[in-house]
């Protein structure tokens, strides 16, 4: 089993993200229709257990993350995906990531069972 992060653009409304033919980028069944939309990133359950949707970093005060999407897994790891690919952030593990928020100062926050964590540059 894998977790996947997909991007839904306005032009993709009604898109087929591959189920039941693919799980993430891994083929499960043949005979898939054309024009499937594949995930931008996927990972196995050896890495995490449940992807938590991403949040765009736009003018969030961290120039190297500007334009990237932050996302994570309920088990703790947090990543950024940008035009240069996916990188795991040097972040302390959070206890059960539940979501993301942006403050009035445009800072991003990771929401977890053990608190609210501001995303800052180290």
What does each model-found stretch correspond to?
Residues 108-111:
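Short, exposed beta-strand-loop hairpins at the edges of beta-sheets
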